[in-house]
Amino acid sequence: MLPLAKNALSRLQVRSIQQVVARQSHQKRAPSFHDKYGNAILAGGAIFCVSTWTYTATQIGIEWNMSPVGRVTPKEWRDQ
């Protein structure tokens, strides 16, 4: 492409982008779903996960395979 044509096209693109940005900045934007409810949904999900894991860890009797160090004593060797 000729340098003159390149320059003209790049200016057209920049100008159209600037016009779009100017139009968007003058309009009042209504809050989206995420703006309205995002933090409440995030907090609710976090509370649900923490409460579910707390119940699971404390109430349903899972054997967690804790370390036997200090609870298991070795048997004496038998001489044969």
Swiss-Prot record:
<dbReference type="GO" id="GO:0045277">
    <property type="term" value="C:respiratory chain complex IV"/>
</dbReference>
<feature type="transit peptide" description="Mitochondrion">
    <location>
        <begin position="1"/>
        <end position="24"/>
    </location>
</feature>
<keyword id="KW-0999">Mitochondrion inner membrane</keyword>
<dbReference type="GO" id="GO:0005743">
    <property type="term" value="C:mitochondrial inner membrane"/>
</dbReference>
<comment type="function">
    <text>Component of the cytochrome c oxidase, the last enzyme in the mitochondrial electron transport chain which drives oxidative phosphorylation. The respiratory chain contains 3 multisubunit complexes succinate dehydrogenase (complex II, CII), ubiquinol-cytochrome c oxidoreductase (cytochrome b-c1 complex, complex III, CIII) and cytochrome c oxidase (complex IV, CIV), that cooperate to transfer electrons derived from NADH and succinate to molecular oxygen, creating an electrochemical gradient over the inner membrane that drives transmembrane transport and the ATP synthase.</text>
</comment>
<feature type="topological domain" description="Mitochondrial intermembrane">
    <location>
        <begin position="61"/>
        <end position="80"/>
    </location>
</feature>
<keyword id="KW-0472">Membrane</keyword>
<comment type="pathway">
    <text>Energy metabolism; oxidative phosphorylation.</text>
</comment>
<comment type="similarity">
    <text>Belongs to the cytochrome c oxidase VIIb family.</text>
</comment>
<keyword id="KW-0812">Transmembrane</keyword>
<dbReference type="InterPro" id="IPR023272">
    <property type="entry name" value="Cyt_c_oxidase_suVIIB_dom_sf"/>
</dbReference>
<dbReference type="Pfam" id="PF05392">
    <property type="entry name" value="COX7B"/>
</dbReference>
<keyword id="KW-0496">Mitochondrion</keyword>
<keyword id="KW-1133">Transmembrane helix</keyword>
<feature type="transmembrane region" description="Helical">
    <location>
        <begin position="40"/>
        <end position="60"/>
    </location>
</feature>
<dbReference type="GO" id="GO:0006123">
    <property type="term" value="P:mitochondrial electron transport, cytochrome c to oxygen"/>
</dbReference>
<comment type="subunit">
    <text>Component of the cytochrome c oxidase (complex IV, CIV), a multisubunit enzyme composed of 14 subunits. The complex is composed of a catalytic core of 3 subunits MT-CO1, MT-CO2 and MT-CO3, encoded in the mitochondrial DNA, and 11 supernumerary subunits COX4I, COX5A, COX5B, COX6A, COX6B, COX6C, COX7A, COX7B, COX7C, COX8 and NDUFA4, which are encoded in the nuclear genome.</text>
</comment>
<protein>
    <recommendedName>
        <fullName>Cytochrome c oxidase subunit 7B, mitochondrial</fullName>
    </recommendedName>
</protein>
<keyword id="KW-0809">Transit peptide</keyword>
<dbReference type="GO" id="GO:0007417">
    <property type="term" value="P:central nervous system development"/>
</dbReference>
<dbReference type="InterPro" id="IPR008433">
    <property type="entry name" value="Cyt_c_oxidase_suVIIB"/>
</dbReference>
<dbReference type="GO" id="GO:0005739">
    <property type="term" value="C:mitochondrion"/>
</dbReference>
<feature type="topological domain" description="Mitochondrial matrix">
    <location>
        <begin position="25"/>
        <end position="39"/>
    </location>
</feature>
